[in-house]
Amino acid sequence: MELTLWTYEGPPHVGAMRIASSMKDIHYVLHAPQGDTYADLLFTMIERRGQRPPVTYTTFQARDLGGDTAELVKKNIKEAVERFKPKTLLVGESCTAELIQDQPGALAKGMGFDMPIVNLELPAYSKKENWGASETFYQLTRTLLKEKVSSSEKISPLRWKELGRRPKVNILGPSLLGFRCRDDVIEIQRILSEQGIDTNVVAPLGASPDDIERLIDAEINICLYPEIAEASCEWLKRNFGMEYTNTIPIGIKNTIEFINEVHKKLDLPLTNKEELENKSKLPWYSKSVDSNYLTGKRVFIFGDGTHAIAAAKIAKEELGFEVVGLGTYSREMARQVRATAKDLNVEALITNNYLEVEDAMKKAAPELVLGTQMERHSAKRLGIPCSVISTPMHVQDVPARYSPQMGWEGANVIFDDWVHPLMMGLEEHLIDMFKHDFEFVDGHQSHLGHTATNTNNILNSDEKKEKNSKEGIIWTESGRAELTKVPFFVRGKVKTNTEKYAILRGIPEISDETLYDAKAYFN
Amino acid sequence: MSKVEFNKETGPREVFCGLTSIVWLHRRMPDAFFLVVGSRTCAHLIQSAAGVMIFAEPRFGTAILEEKDLAGLADAHEELDRVVNDLIARRPEIKTLFLVGSCPSEVIKLDLATVAEKLNKRFLGQVRFVNYSGSGIETTFTQGEDGALKALIPLMESSNEEKLLLVGTLANNVEDRFKKIFKNLGISNIESFPPRQSTELPKIGKNTKVLLTQPYLSDTVRDLKHRGCEIISAPFPLGIEGSTEWFLAAAKAFKINELKVHEILSPLINRAKLALESHKEILKGKRLFLLPESQLEISLARFLHNECEMDLVEVGTPYLNKDLMKEEINLLPDNTKIVEGQHVEKQLDRVRESNPDLVVCGMGLANPLEAEGISTKWSIEMVFSPIHGIDQAADLAGLFSKPLRRNQILTTKTLVTH
Ligand code: SF4
Ligand code: SF4
């Protein structure tokens, strides 16, 4: 048993949902109790998706357990197929269903449908979300392409020359609930096309089962998010000889290296290096005199393997920071993260426990934290500025504007996102100067200085004001008590309104009743 | 009973499980800790349902079952022991520890009652252990609170003192208001269950008169009855009508003159009516579809129809206790269609067909419906916002008028979503 107060990754079937929801013409029947439907909100709320995930839950209940849950599974599969008419069906189970061993995948296969069925076995008690996503994508690729394995010969990365067309690549790994995947794909496609390279298929994001069957029309695969795509890339390499890339194009140096790698694999001549370096503002912004203050800033990094490693490299080599902590929750990437940490002379932190991360953060005493949503909270508690660089994320980490992490524009975004929290030093100053101003009730603080002392100061000054309102109106005990119960972000408004009301009505003392009267009056 | 149309539906659902109640229960009783014995899914659920709004170390957690725990139950018990020891060492301020069962722990028949019993002996005088199930194979959303409260009843001492016991978690400010009003009515011995501290459980007995504040407490009510408490039958204190009836029912149980109640409530009522006007203007004549989630749906439908003049297309509820809801159902308009249970696909078909102005639904469904041009309101907000009582009637209406108002401001109906 593992005690968890907060988890970085969901269960493996949530990973499977990420693949299913990323794609078209796919449906996933998930043998699960009703409560597991919460997972839908990850997509419809964090990602603000306008469609429900293509998932049908069997919703078995305790009273079904004695009877025939297998029948319930079949009924739900039948209904889902009739209603959604998917081109490919995924069938799997969540943690509870795994225990009752109905084997829904096998049941589905016995039902005589003519579409491909992928039977997902994702051990819920030993594996997690990213593994589940990777396994699902791999099983899907395998199922849809396995018939073509024997008939096809190995794919040469130079095939495009023989065929007399531009080289074609697949971009593999982007998925819903991945960090900024949607925009990364646009950026990478743009970069490749500038280099004369066409994109054959992007998957799973936006792909259909037909697209998966077309994967072998490309010369090489771009393994953009190894957490999700590496297993599939390996399989495609083993069975079709397709090469895949290793460099993740996050940061200027990695982007250039990535372009080099692709070019080498495809035997393309490379564009001039200087021109590439000028494609992003990061190098100049980082060099400009204003950035002097960034020198040697101490950063602490924690996230998924891919983003943490990339962040460490950018921090050190492109922004001139000092990396004082590096870690990941992706056990699958532990080896690579350790190697990167060793190069930076820090000890890698491989853990699932956010409290351990918070402790390490406290010890390292950084000036900036680059982490997940959870490190944002920890950093806030410690009063350290933070920027989110990896999942798990918050709805605010899915911005409306174009904001990739990869490629040239990604580097610009990274510069802004990492540096802006630091520049708030001036703002903090101003807030401190003006904190006795009426506007600065306890909700109106900068996102950084969320420390206890700060809040207390503001509360105290607020309280003083409550006692002596300008017009000589007195707040009675009950009135004041009632006012403190109003949420801080509207308290100021409620207070002013109530006083306004009291003056209007010639009420000298504000009680809780006055507050409610005023509330009703202004409603 | 009015001519209400009852329907039952089964099929795929879209409802949280009872674990979700932890989100408000742990805030109500800051000296308690909720330890879910479950899977990574359970951990992920409460974290997602709590939003990512955890500011401090939360007072809930999950002991995640692993492969080796499934192999042998003896080991699972030992492991749980170890986790509890660690937890208590780390959080010495915990006074009550709830061991919360989940689907996996129930399916493998992990006996949390026995575990709790053993731990109670070991930590005697330091921490109390209680257990209940919040599993999704047995409970939905708000029913977790029912389980937690029911589990506390055996710990409540007996007393024959006459008192009013308000049962169900309320926002603190609402609770204070209620107590004040009851005092004005002449009922001064009032206690709340759950209390604000888990260790300050009210004493109960045959002179305890129970007034429910939430409709989802069937099991708790049954056990309180067994302990001799008298259950006051009333609608729920949502809206002016429900709250007035609720106060009246309590007054009657305490033999307080009805006129006095009216005298005390009428200024509150007048002011609430005034406050309600602007919302009513927006809500009037609008068609409302409630999908099942919190069991508050029937009371909400009653309020939104009777006081805000909305038309009810369908009132879904995950579970219906006709006995507890008797007074509410009496107040519903004729021919109200109540649907217990859920087949989410068929229900959504009916939503689309009837094209309502507003749908009350769970968080997973809201954006997809908005994308189809249908305004929505999250039902989870009803359990997080102070909505009870006469003074809150306008706020309650405001929760529903806001999406419609917003819809009027932003005229685009169907949007391309990404
Ligand atoms: S439905 Fe069951 S398995 Fe799922 S989160 Fe709730 S208790 Fe856990
Ligand atoms: S505190 Fe700020 S960052 Fe954290 S969840 Fe709330 S809004 Fe998001």
Curated annotation (Swiss-Prot), chain A:
Residue sites binding substrate per the record: G425, L426
Annotated region described as Disordered, given as residue ranges: 451-470
Single GO MF descriptor: oxidoreductase activity, acting on the CH-CH group of donors, iron-sulfur protein as acceptor
Catalytic residues (UniProt): D290 (proton donor)
Cofactor(s) named in the record: [4Fe-4S] cluster
Reaction(s) this enzyme catalyzes, per UniProt: chlorophyllide a + oxidized 2[4Fe-4S]-[ferredoxin] + 2 ADP + 2 phosphate = protochlorophyllide a + reduced 2[4Fe-4S]-[ferredoxin] + 2 ATP + 2 H2O
Binding site for [4Fe-4S] cluster: D36
Pathway: Porphyrin-containing compound metabolism; chlorophyll biosynthesis (light-independent)
Gene Ontology BP term (one): light-independent chlorophyll biosynthetic process
Domain of life of the source: Bacteria
Cofactor descriptive note: Binds 1 [4Fe-4S] cluster per heterodimer. The cluster is bound at the heterodimer interface by residues from both subunits.
Keyword Lipid metabolism: no
Coiled coil location: none
Enzyme Commission numbers on file: 1.3.7.7
Ranges of Basic and acidic residues composition bias in the record: 461-470
Pfam family, one: Oxidored_nitro
Family annotation (SUPFAM superfamilies): Helical backbone' metal receptor
Keywords for this protein: 4Fe-4S, ATP-binding, Chlorophyll biosynthesis, Iron, Iron-sulfur, Metal-binding, Nucleotide-binding, Oxidoreductase, Photosynthesis
Quaternary structure and partners: Protochlorophyllide reductase is composed of three subunits; ChlL, ChlN and ChlB. Forms a heterotetramer of two ChlB and two ChlN subunits.
Family indicated by similarity: Belongs to the ChlB/BchB/BchZ family.
Role: Component of the dark-operative protochlorophyllide reductase (DPOR) that uses Mg-ATP and reduced ferredoxin to reduce ring D of protochlorophyllide (Pchlide) to form chlorophyllide a (Chlide). This reaction is light-independent. The NB-protein (ChlN-ChlB) is the catalytic component of the complex.
Name recorded for this polypeptide: Light-independent protochlorophyllide reductase subunit B
UniProt lineage: Bacteria, Bacillati, Cyanobacteriota, Cyanophyceae, Synechococcales
Gene that this polypeptide is encoded by: chlB
Swiss-Prot record, chain B:
Keywords: 4Fe-4S, ATP-binding, Chlorophyll biosynthesis, Iron, Iron-sulfur, Metal-binding, Nucleotide-binding, Oxidoreductase, Photosynthesis
Cofactors named for this entry: [4Fe-4S] cluster
Any one GO biological process: photosynthesis, dark reaction
One Gene Ontology MF term: oxidoreductase activity, acting on the CH-CH group of donors, iron-sulfur protein as acceptor
Keyword Repeat: no
Signal peptide location: none
Cofactor binding summary note: Binds 1 [4Fe-4S] cluster per heterodimer. The cluster is bound at the heterodimer interface by residues from both subunits.
Pathway(s) per entry: Porphyrin-containing compound metabolism; chlorophyll biosynthesis (light-independent)
Catalytic activity: chlorophyllide a + oxidized 2[4Fe-4S]-[ferredoxin] + 2 ADP + 2 phosphate = protochlorophyllide a + reduced 2[4Fe-4S]-[ferredoxin] + 2 ATP + 2 H2O
Positions that bind [4Fe-4S] cluster: C17, C42, C103
Record-listed E.C. numbers: 1.3.7.7
Pfam families listed in its UniProt record: Oxidored_nitro
Quaternary structure note: Protochlorophyllide reductase is composed of three subunits; ChlL, ChlN and ChlB. Forms a heterotetramer of two ChlB and two ChlN subunits.
Function of the molecule: Component of the dark-operative protochlorophyllide reductase (DPOR) that uses Mg-ATP and reduced ferredoxin to reduce ring D of protochlorophyllide (Pchlide) to form chlorophyllide a (Chlide). This reaction is light-independent. The NB-protein (ChlN-ChlB) is the catalytic component of the complex.
Family of this protein: Belongs to the BchN/ChlN family.
HAMAP family listed in its UniProt record: ChlN_BchN
Protein name listed in UniProt: Light-independent protochlorophyllide reductase subunit N
Origin species: Prochlorococcus marinus (strain AS9601)
Record gene name: chlN
